Amino acid sequence: MDQGLSTGAHQDTDGLRERNTRVDSTVGREALTAVGEGEIKDKDGKASKTFGRTPDGTVFTVPQTHDMVSQLLLPSEPKNFGDLVVLILLAGHIMFLWALPAGAKIPIFAVTYLFWRLAYNAGIGWLLHNQSHHKTLIRWAEKTKVFVNPATGENPHPKLYNWIKRELETKIPQDYSFDNAPIEYNTWLVFRRLVDLILMCDFTSYCLFAIACGHQPVDESILMTVLRWSAGIVLVLFNLWVKLDAHRVVKDYAWYWGDFFYLIDQELTFDGVFEMAPHPMYSVGYAGYYGISLMAASYKVLFISIIAHAAQFAFLVLVENPHIDKTYNPPPPRKRSSTCADSSSTLPTDLDTPTAPTPSEDQTPNATYSYSVKPPQPVHNLLGLHNLDLYRTTDSSIMLVQLLVFSITALTPSTPWYQLLFVVLAAISRIWYSVGIGYILRNQSNTKSWTRHFVKYGDTPQEAWNQWKGTYHLSMILCYSSFIAAVWKMYTFPADWGYGLVLFRHVLGAGLISLQIWTSVSIYESLGEFGWFYGDFFFDDSPKLTYNGIYRFLNNPERVLGLAGVWGAVLITSSGAVTFLALLSHILSLAFIQFVERPHMQKLYGRSLRQDAGLVKSLKRSLPPSLKQLHGSVDKMFDDSFEFIEEMLDNARPKLAAGVNTFVKDTTALFQKYPARVTIARIDADLAGFDVRDYALSVEGTSALSFEESEKNKGREGANARMPLDRRGDLKDLTFEYGSPIRVKWTAPLHHSKKDWIGLYRVTDNTSREVTRVSSQGRWVATNEGAYDNLTCEKGILTSDVVIPSSERQGQDPCEFASGEIVFAGDKLFWTQGVFELRYHHNGMHNVMAISRPFEIRIRRSDEDETISDGDSFVESAVENALLPVVRNCFDRDPEIAPETVDEQFGTLVERDGKFAKRVVFAVHQMFGIELAAEVVKADGNVRNLAWRICNAKKVLAPYSMSRSNGTTTPLEESKE
């Protein structure tokens, strides 16, 4: 329903803090969506047709439809049986509220509302998730043949067919034919009726619950009552406008998740509410819930509103966003070079992405130093718990600082002196974070002082950038840690939560804190690590502004929303000291934007800066002319004030600089003078008539060097065991390459169940040979298509039910049998080494009908002696040749991402989905004993760079290796001549 990512159908090219982010070549949901069945006027002013396109390419005319409220409540709209059912249910809810005793109304309607909310977010969410991934609703319609004309004799439900046809054609009298419409569109129309029922009951039960909880608080003044009702009505009206405007923009097509079923051949501009906020249907579109909570004056309504809102965000994150990314943001097609030479000529030359230097370069001590002004590849990010690395000085320092701050906070009493101490510490940390960091960035912008300092001592700009990131990150953590400590010291646990507005203040404060956290996450998602740490102050690399994420709607989200949490702390503590800290933080943040960010952005991007963001544009359009003029006067006043302050600071800068230089010199001299150092087995009951001897599995794959072949002649076995076994025919070892597809041939009786399936397991997973008791964890493939409401289980089916004549059935009863082939690849494999088997299961259950021969998945470990040549120089070509087939297997041999040559770049999906890089990391560790991070594989970008990195890592670690190539493991005294 929400089209949050569709709001930027046309993007501006100007703005403030969108810092030179990498531009994604893919398009958002706005490229092919929205507004399907709305009337679109052509150049002659006539209504033009809207065309839909099904996944199989069928093009059809999308008729115009109307929203559910109009269809239900307007007498002019045609009604059908489904409308009557919805109206009767709504009337039943109202009568139920009237009939219940006073003490039972609140709990019963709370349960009723939660039921409908669960049906919305969990029920509809489950249907949409499966429709997106497996086309489940379409497959149900195809299986039941409910949309097939009974005249063909194939529809087993002719009465149901006629009833659905009458219902749908009654609602859509024009441009619609039930018999001619594609099955996707008819399925969507039926799905709409279910959505209408759930949404109407959801909203009605919520309003009735609010009525049941509504009351007049004791001793509430008339003024407070008027303010409460006025604010509530304003929020409800705003919510109503958001819904109506959103429906005006996206129409029924997006309102009812039409793109889960088909797409619209149309690209339109999104405006109105979609310029104001991200995902307006799920964010500001729930403002009315809080307005109703105010009018009801009930914390019960408020808390259930928060639960509903949180469930809606979960629906967005788990259902809608994955579908949006899959449908509208696929990875761009990879750029293939015509020749290897062309490919090699475009290799990156960044420091963090080496290009296999020549031996002469490699022997030069400083050959790897590069003073490139290009930003380094993001390999080892700082932000996020998943990036925490205690081996890194910055991370360990941050952990120690936080441990120290919070330990002192917890172990000291909350006396006035300690409270003052923590408030002063928080104020100093904030001043350093805004003023100190701002001073460094301003000088970096003007004179590159930070980078020059490191270059002066022989370091690279990349080293300066890394040191800056650590400094900024530590300053930010110290600022917020000290603020939290000060808030904790000033906070007093309420003696009575029901007194006055205590509970309301805590709820609102927690909401503001959550808003700041969400804003920070959104900013980081939009800017990335490079923009978060102000990378364009350090690297001037073809600056180009892009506006995505939260920056579509706000130029500087950190100006207001980014500090909502500090004001939330003010509400929770009701402390003057915390209010002072919040005010100080806000003033310093605004000054930082005005005196540091804005001048740099104007210098870097010039006239391309955007004056008004989407939210401001929407508000300006709705303002009367007099208020627009007032807005311009206020802006001029603020600009004049900031110019005066800036001139004053410019005049005072020489004196301040002289004082700071004197202080630094004195301090440096002082330090130089005084240095200081269950699994449930589902047994099928209909096994009668099936003989397990009629089932068989055979396995084929890309052979690899077996363990026995690689370890023979080591002299560890007894004399009789040193000769290799004579393995021929069916006794030959099955050892396959890591990640290579496994082809399975199966045979079964002709009357075998169409729901049979084959799963992949470790040999040690199951002790029983008759029943599988361990989950396959998605590593299974159905033997026949269409047997399951799941597309994933059909990936890998090559052939099914190929009849094999009895003449080919040697040594068994002469009768025909069915056979087929499937392939296990990609996510259906175990991405590790070990011994595995395949199991054929009966009728969707876990009864085992056949088990394949065990086979081994193995990665051959590289012999160091084979990869070392004269002068202890690793032969990179050997490493490249060993890596290339493994990397191709790790990338599922997908031509869009798997390289054909060592110079060809990896596909963009490798950067999006971390599983591919992690597979390569495991293989490299097993082959060469080198442990790399997944980010390194992404940054290297091709096999040649990865091989170069492995060879250099081997050289660095060679002195610590225990291999024979590095001499004896225990140094011996050289014999004297």
Curated annotation (Swiss-Prot):
One Pfam family here: PEMT
Bias-annotated ranges (Low complexity): 341-360
One example of a Gene Ontology biological process annotation: methylation
Ranges per topology, Lumenal: 1-83, 129-193, 243-275, 320-397, 441-469, 528-575
One annotated GO molecular function: phosphatidylethanolamine N-methyltransferase activity
Cytoplasmic side: 105-107, 215-221, 297-298, 419, 493-506, 597-977
Pathway stated in the Swiss-Prot or TrEMBL entry: Phospholipid metabolism; phosphatidylcholine biosynthesis
Record's compositionally biased regions (Basic and acidic residues): 11-22
GO cellular component, one term: endoplasmic reticulum membrane
Enzyme Commission (EC) number: 2.1.1.17
Biased composition (Polar residues): 1-10, 361-370
Transmembrane region(s): 84-104, 108-128, 194-214, 222-242, 276-296, 299-319, 398-418, 420-440, 470-492, 507-527, 576-596
Record region (Disordered): 1-23, 328-370
Catalytic activity from the UniProt record: a 1,2-diacyl-sn-glycero-3-phosphoethanolamine + S-adenosyl-L-methionine = a 1,2-diacyl-sn-glycero-3-phospho-N-methylethanolamine + S-adenosyl-L-homocysteine + H(+)
InterPro entries: Phopholipid_MeTrfase, Phosphatid-EA_MeTrfase_fun
Membrane-topology descriptor: Multi-pass membrane protein
Uppermost EC category: transferase
Record-annotated disulphide pairs: none
Job of this protein: Catalyzes the first step of the methylation pathway of phosphatidylcholine biosynthesis, the SAM-dependent methylation of phosphatidylethanolamine (PE) to phosphatidylmonomethylethanolamine (PMME).
Family: Belongs to the class VI-like SAM-binding methyltransferase superfamily. CHO2 family.
Record's protein name: Phosphatidylethanolamine N-methyltransferase
